[in-house]
Amino acid sequence: LPLYRQSIDWEWYERQYSPPDVFAKTVYTWPAERIREMQSERFLSVVAQGWQNQFYSARWREAGLAPDDIRSLDDITRLPLFDSDDIKKSLERDPPYGDFHGVNSSHMQATPFKLQTSGGTTGLPRGTLSEPIAWETQALAGARAMYVQGARPGDVMQIPMTCSLANAPWLAYKACHDYLGVLPLTTGTGVVTATRQQLEFAFRYGTNLWTSFPEYLLRLASACETELDRDVRELNTKFIRSFLGPDLDGALRAELQERWGCPIYDTYGTHEVGTAGFECTHQTGMHLMEDCVYLE
């Protein structure tokens, strides 16, 4: 059987992708030159894998490229782009998973995979298969961000998002449980655990961290007053990890921080890569997970 715990060389993995406390003292503080050297090495490794994948290699050959043409990260602009429409065509061409994964039935039988999907805003949600290293790295990236923001062993993080085909709640759970020593309180959405009960659980178990969407955080703060006759600030929350994309003028963050009495940190990610960018305690912009992603 393809046992998950045997699917990764864990000592190798930790050398490649440092755990949160080590990351905060190494990659997170490295100078740009050292980051660039590491990224170039990893980029070439990924490109070599891409040449073994029909979806990528066909596109690259159509663009007139050969394997020897890509020699460093400086050559990334020579690689043709693809978009969600190309992924949809891949799914239609080779259902149900598409050929962009480079996965066949023998891989599926020998390796544990996790399926997550997009939100489906432009059509049927697109599925992405994550093999163990990709799945772990998504969770680890979230854990690193939380550690930099102040999460520590013994904290309790409430996750009022349902573990479904969306990856955010799964990764928050794994980040806490597998990499931080933080207790994940997986209450799910209000459909699973009513808002009043969410708050009752929070007070009972000492929730001091949250991962949630801003709109529901406002709902929780209001319900705490109207249904429990309490102030949500009584929870003494250390910080909240949220997703503030629509908050262009900062008004929503300001309201949330006032009502909760704690910092609200923005997060950027996708269902394909997990946490790509995060805010630190200074809240002056995004840090990138630079040993995992590259921003052009």
For each feature predicted by the language model, list its residue ranges:
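Active-site glycine/GP-rich loop and adjacent strand/helix microenvironment
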Residues: 1-34, 41, 45-48, 181-296
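Nucleotide 5′-phosphate-binding alpha/beta core
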Residues: 1-117, 124-137, 148, 204, ...
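Conserved S/T- and glycine-rich ATP-binding loop of Class I adenylate-forming
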Residues: 50, 117-121, 157, 210, ...
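Conserved ATP-dependent adenylate/AMP-binding module captured primarily in the ANL superfamily
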Residues: 74, 138-156, 193-206
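Short glycine-enriched loops at secondary-structure junctions
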Residues: 112, 135, 162-166, 215
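Active-site phosphate/pyrophosphate- and oxyanion-stabilizing loops and adjacent acidic/basic residues
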Residues: 116, 174, 254
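Acidic/glycine-enriched edge-of-secondary-structure segments
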Residues: 123-137, 175, 182-186, 206-215
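Conserved AMP-binding loop of ANL adenylate-forming enzymes
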Residues: 143-179
